[in-house]
Every structure is written in C-alpha cells, then in structure tokens.
C-alpha cells in the first residue's frame, strides 16, 4: 500500500461525494429478481434518503431512518436459498455508479428475528468482507465491480420471520472520530423451512460499535498492511453460543469480481445436499449476476451451477471459523479466486456467505439545470445545477457536498 496513492484518493474523495450515497433497492432469490423492494408496497424498510448514518449510538443504526416501520411485504425463503442484495445510488439503470470508488470499506450482513431485531437486539453476523492485501482491494471495490450485488446463503434456522441487514462502512473520512459512514437497510424475510440451528443471542445495534473501534476510526490514506473488520465473529451456522466481538476473517473471491458471466456454484447448509440454483425457482439464465455462494454451515461439497449472461457475477464472502485476527484475507484469496471458474465448487467453512456493495446511479444533472432527488446541488468546486426538482430541497452535508433530499 503506497501512502501517495491514498493521498491522491483523499483529494479525489471530496470531488466524488456526489456518488457517495447508496441504499439497498432490490433482492434476488436463487437468481430470480424479486423486483424493487424500496417502494411503498415493497419488502425493504427503506429510509427517506440515501444518506449515511454517522452516529454509532443512534437508533438509526438498527435499520436506518424509519427502520422501525415494517415494510408492506415479506419475502419467503428456505434454508440453502441464495439471497442477493442489490445496492444503488439512485436507480437500477446501467449508468448507476453504486458507490463512489473513494468510499473504501467493509461490507457485512447481519440477521435477527424480526421482533427482536426491530428493537435493536439479537443481531448475528452471517457474512463479512474487508481488505485484501494481495490484490489491494476493499470489499466496496469488489461490490462496485459486481454491479452492486453480493450474496448470502440462508442458514438452517427455525421457521419464522427474520430481518436481514446488509451494511457498508465507508472509511473515506474514517481518519477522524465520527467520520465513518454507515449504510444499511433491513429486508424482511419469512423462513419457511424449519431448521434446528437457533441463532445465537447476538449483539445489540446500536451498541456493537463505538466511534473509536480500530476498524471504524481507521485512516485509509496512510500505509497499512491489514484491516480489523468491526463487530462480532461471523456465526458458524450451527453453534448456539453468544455472538460476541472477537477476531475473525472472511475470504472473498476477487476473481468473481471480474465482469465475467461464467457459471458459478452454490453450496447449501448441512441439512441439504445442494441448492439447485438452476431449477425453476432460480431461472437458469438471468438478466443479472448469478451469485457465488458459500453455505451457512459445512456441507458435503454438493454444488449446483448457474449460468449468467449479462452482469458480473456477485461476489460471495466465504466465511470461516476464526482464530486469527480479522485482517487481510490473503490466506484464502488464491483458493477463492478459483470460485469464479465456470461450474466450480465452493465449500463453505462453517459460516454464511454474503455480500457486495450497491450500484449507485451517476450524479449527472437532469435536463433544464435542475438536479434530481439524491443528486448533487452545491458545494466547493460544484459546477452543476443548484436547484432541486419539485419535492426536494438542497441540503448541505459538508462544505464539499450539497444534496437534493426529500422535502420534510
């Protein structure tokens, strides 16, 4: 890691803030698009804007602003299903930029029973990815390369309603206390299979992080060799002990981030032999990326292939039981890079796989010199429109970035 490289990124960050913000907008189940979920009749507890949460003690850390309000719909899944989260800055168009490339950081996924999770309790981490020294890549870099998509495999938990909480921590201002930006939403699911692996007691959100945690107060612009992913260990998919903060690591296939459409494999939790992602429920050929997945529990190397023809295959974070520090994933990068090969197998070492960032739409101004909602409307060096479309107001976030947000 060269200090000069990140010094340049620091300068670039201010000018790219218009592309910074992001939200989860859709979900895929076994390769099948579930449609927009951030609508009034959707299945995502969506905030009123795509702005980050920066106060780790705020109740907005649980499911974002208005996250205590239930969404209209709930998606049905079963153990072993592959769930793909799709992030965007503005919309699902091809021009959407997902998240600014300067916004380096980890991507994680938590889950909790709906009633408890809504109150900020019993959150269990099922996937994580951070920094890869061997390729000098962050999880957000991989997310961008994969068009804002990342996967988890539904663990073999008892039937019931659950919230899945994908999260991005952007560290472009992480060199100062309170500078890290948190992006998260809660997606509503009903698990229809009835597994025997109860979730651990988990952690509280807010409560799991502090503003001075090593992975939150972190300077990406100075030289470093590793990165400590914040939060608890990734659950192994079977143990019922409490999920507390500790050391862990996660491996991700950087090769899967290439814009290829090779077939990828999915493995299932221990109670199932394989997930046929190419079955009728999964549509063998999809318009978006077919997930690369590892399971929430060890399996017998059973796999199933999916063929994708359009976008890059989403990266799956194959997690493992952790004994060493949560730092660079270099020990597993080579083996996981093989995951991207067509019809390759992935055996998940006892944990749920998951995540990649969102696709943000470009912040270009709309016709007529009026900025659309979520687009930039002012700040240092801004040369675009300063007037927002009807229903939006121009809000100052910092001297460099003003954004059109919904009128209150």
Curated annotation (Swiss-Prot):
Q: Which organism is it from?
A: Aspergillus kawachii (strain NBRC 4308)
A single GO cellular-component term from the record reads: extracellular region
Q: Which Gene3D superfamilies match?
A: 2.70.50.70
Which SMART domains did the record assign? fCBD
The entry assigns this protein to a family as follows: Belongs to the polysaccharide monooxygenase AA9 family.
Q: Which cysteines are joined by disulfide bonds?
A: 63-186
* Binding of O2, residues: 172
Pfam short name (any one): CBM_1
Residues annotated as binding Cu(2+) are 21, 103, 183
What the entry lists under PROSITE patterns is as follows: CBM1_1, CBM1_2
Q: Where is the CBM1 domain?
A: 369-405
Q: Name one GO molecular function term.
A: monooxygenase activity
What does the record give as EC number? 1.14.99.56
Signal peptide (residue range): 1-20
Report which reactions are catalysed by this protein.
[(1->4)-beta-D-glucosyl]n+m + reduced acceptor + O2 = 4-dehydro-beta-D-glucosyl-[(1->4)-beta-D-glucosyl]n-1 + [(1->4)-beta-D-glucosyl]m + acceptor + H2O
Principal cellular location given in the protein's record: secreted
In UniProt terms, what function does this protein have? Lytic polysaccharide monooxygenase (LPMO) that depolymerizes crystalline and amorphous polysaccharides via the oxidation of scissile alpha- or beta-(1-4)-glycosidic bonds, yielding C4 oxidation products. Catalysis by LPMOs requires the reduction of the active-site copper from Cu(II) to Cu(I) by a reducing agent and H(2)O(2) or O(2) as a cosubstrate.
Which enzyme class, named as a word? oxidoreductase
Where is the protein localized?
Secreted
Query: What is recorded about the protein's domains?
Result: Has a modular structure: an endo-beta-1,4-glucanase catalytic module at the N-terminus, a linker rich in serines and threonines, and a C-terminal carbohydrate-binding module (CBM). The CBM domain is essential for binding to and subsequent oxidative degradation of polysaccharide substrate.
Applied uses are: Lignocellulose is the most abundant polymeric composite on Earth and is a recalcitrant but promising renewable substrate for industrial biotechnology applications. Together with cellobiose dehydrogenases (CDHs) an enzymatic system capable of oxidative cellulose cleavage is formed, which increases the efficiency of cellulases and put LPMOs at focus of biofuel research.
This chain's protein is named AA9 family lytic polysaccharide monooxygenase A
Look up the record and give one Gene Ontology term from the biological process aspect.
cellulose catabolic process
Cofactor detail note: Binds 1 copper ion per subunit.
């Amino acid at each position: 890691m060269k200090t000069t490289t990140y010094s340049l990124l620091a300068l670039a960050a201010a000018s790219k803030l218009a592309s910074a913000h992001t939200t989860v907008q859709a979900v895929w189940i076994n390769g099948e698009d579930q449609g927009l979920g951030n609508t009034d009749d959707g299945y995502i507890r969506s905030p009123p804007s795509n702005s980050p949460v920066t106060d780790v003690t705020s109740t907005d850390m649980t499911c974002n602003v208005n996250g205590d309000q239930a969404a209209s719909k709930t998606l049905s899944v079963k153990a072993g299903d592959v769930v793909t989260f799709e992030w965007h800055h503005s919309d699902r168009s091809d021009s959407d930029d997902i998240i600014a490339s300067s916004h380096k950081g980890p991507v994680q996924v938590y889950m909790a029973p709906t009633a408890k999770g809504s109150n900020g309790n019993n959150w269990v981490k099922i996937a994580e990815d951070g920094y890869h020294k061997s390729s000098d890549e962050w999880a957000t870099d991989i997310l961008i390369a994969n068009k804002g998509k990342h996967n988890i495999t539904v663990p073999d938990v008892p039937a019931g309603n659950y919230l899945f909480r994908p999260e991005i921590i952007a560290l472009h201002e992480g060199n100062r206390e309170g500078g890290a930006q948190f992006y998260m939403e809660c997606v509503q699911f009903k698990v229809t299979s009835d597994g025997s692996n109860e979730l651990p007691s988990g952690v509280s959100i807010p409560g799991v992080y502090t503003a001075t945690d090593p992975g939150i107060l972190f300077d990406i612009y100075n030289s470093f060799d590793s990165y400590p992913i914040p939060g608890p260990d990734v659950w192994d998919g079977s143990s019922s002990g409490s999920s507390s903060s500790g050391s862990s690591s996660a491996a991700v296939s950087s090769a899967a981030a290439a814009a290829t459409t090779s077939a990828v494999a999915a493995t299932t939790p221990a109670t199932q032999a394989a997930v046929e992602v190419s079955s009728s429920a999964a549509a063998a050929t999809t318009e978006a990326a077919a997930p690369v997945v590892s399971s929430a529990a060890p399996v017998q190397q059973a796999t199933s292939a999916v063929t994708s023809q359009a976008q890059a295959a989403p990266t799956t974070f194959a997690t493992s039981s952790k004994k060493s520090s949560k730092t660079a994933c270099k020990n597993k990068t080579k083996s996981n890079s093989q995951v991207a090969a067509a019809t390759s197998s992935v055996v998940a070492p006892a944990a749920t796989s998951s995540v990649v960032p969102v696709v943000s739409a470009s912040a270009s101004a709309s016709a007529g010199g009026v900025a659309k909602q979520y687009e930039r409307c002012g700040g240092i060096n801004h040369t675009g429109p300063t007037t927002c479309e009807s229903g939006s107001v121009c809000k100052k976030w910092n001297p460099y970035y003003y954004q059109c947000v919904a009128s209150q």
